[in-house]
Amino acid sequence: MPRYPYRELKPTPEGEATYTRWITHLDTEFTRHHKPELRSEIVRDELHQLYLGRPHGGKLNFNMVTELPFNVLQLSLDPRNATLEPEYYGDLNPEKYAPLKPLIWFWQMFDRSPVGLNHWLGFRFRAMLGRHIFKHIGKNVKIFHGVEFSYGYNLTIEDNCTIHK
């Protein structure tokens, strides 16, 4: 059976520049901030923009019952308000996992957003997060939409690896 290489696809120059700038910004922020609290705030703010199209801020209105679903949505974008499956496991290392949880939540929520369906952006986004989550991630790694993992801190992914769901 013949082996066919992946085709090289690109967004528009404007799209590529914007996507690259966003990923570089996130990479810089996650490199600067290792504390779970700060990473959670960064993730919350970015998800707020991705899902709701506006910056995080303002007070939630807890008095109006009609506002409750929107409050639930806003609060659910913050990784501190989410529990992930690995947190229930007895073999979890809480010290290693705590700074990674916001990034794992970001990965999962990115993949569930319309933006996460963009493969060009997604490959680069997941590789960037992988540098902060995994024990090691090689060069030219492509991780497709929908791939999930439990901890991340014990994973090594070598160069030129492609992972599908």
Task: Specify the residue positions occupied by each region the protein language model found.
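Conserved phosphate/pyrophosphate-binding and hydrolysis machinery centered on Walker-type P-loop NTPases
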Residues: F123, S150-Y151
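A structural motif detector for beta-strand N-caps
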Residues: K135, K139-I143, V147-F149, L155, ...
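Terminal amphipathic alpha-helical/low-complexity segments used for targeting or macromolecular assembly
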Residues: M1-H132
